[in-house]
Design a protein with these regions (language model features):
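Rossmann-fold dinucleotide-binding core
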Residues: 4, 96-175
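NAD(P)+-binding Rossmann beta1-loop-alpha1 motif at the extreme N-terminus of oxidoreductases
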Residues: 1-64, 125
Length: 276
């Protein structure tokens, strides 16, 4: 049975600890913020004095810190995980960071015979508490098999994306899609406002009339064989409607840089499809 440690018990870390408690797992934890440690103590966790001390008493360490610098420091720095970890310890990096950072940490860990997997989280604390967290994971199939039972105590689904670092890439592109939708909707309602449409009415219309994420029908938009990532142009959308809305924004004198870039991207896709 794995002995579980956790570095970083902020909002996400505490939510993960709640799930682990429900599964009967008592973790040893460390954080630089004392009030968070007291909340972890209230959940029945043991408190360590450093990341190294967590690793000394663990076979599996969840790393739930915020930035690339934080990950490097708490794993490879003084009093970090690698200073205390025994051979065959598995470090699961849950932070949203660059894949190159994951690979840098993995390279440092190899000298200590410590394994590293990026197991990035797709959700917020309420998602975790509701048991709906998903993990996108990069690492070998053997390490995935070891990590998955632990991950499923904290979430509902694990997606293996490929080798080390691909979990981090997957998290970033997933958030890229989510964030870009918000930004383009903002530009769309600016165009609607300029055309006399109150934005709540525009948003309600777009929600009710045929708005469907491309992800729900990606096999119709992209080649499902995986051989060609070029999207199909779509009847009248990329070759007519997107250019028209770009013209409309110019007529209104609006600064909509994402829409303008979409117009250029649509033209390239239409041309590429014509040349196939």
């Amino acid at each position: 049975m794995e002995q579980v440690g956790m570095i970083g018990v902020g909002a996400m870390g505490l939510a993960l600890l709640e799930r682990l408690k429900l599964a009967g797992v008592q973790a040893i934890v460390y954080d630089t913020y004392a009030p968070s440690l007291e909340q972890a103590r209230a959940l029945g966790c043991r408190i360590a004095s450093s990341a190294a001390d967590v690793a000394r008493e663990s076979t599996l360490v969840d790393v739930v810190v915020r930035t690339d610098v934080d990950v490097i420091q708490c794993v490879t720095g003084p009093d970090g995980v690698l200073e205390g970890a025994k051979p065959d310890t598995l470090a699961l990096i849950h932070s949203s960071i660059l894949p190159q950072t994951v690979q840098q940490v993995e390279a440092a860990a190899q000298s200590k015979s410590v394994f590293v997997v990026d197991a990035c989280m797709t959700g917020v604390p309420d998602t975790v508490r509701g048991g709906n967290l998903c993990f996108v994971v990069g690492g070998t199939k053997e390490l995935l098999a070891r990590a998955e039972p632990h991950l499923l105590k904290m979430g509902k689904q694990v997606f293996h994306m490929g080798p080390t670092g691909t979990g981090a890439v997957a998290k970033l592109i997933k958030n890229m899609v989510s964030g870009s939708e918000t930004l383009i909707v903002y530009e769309a309602i600016q165009i609607g406002l300029a055309g006399g449409i109150p934005y709540p009415k525009a948003l309600e219309m777009m929600r009710e009339i045929g708005h469907d994420s491309v992800l729900n029908r990606w096999q119709r938009t992209f080649d499902p064989s995986g051989e060609n990532p070029l999207p199909k142009s779509g009847r009248n959308v990329m070759n007519k409607d997107i250019p028209l809305v770009c013209d409309l924004a110019k007529l209104y004198g609006l600064d909509v840089p994402i829409t303008e870039q979409l117009g250029r991207a649509a033209a390239r896709i239409v041309k590429a499809n014509e040349e196939r």
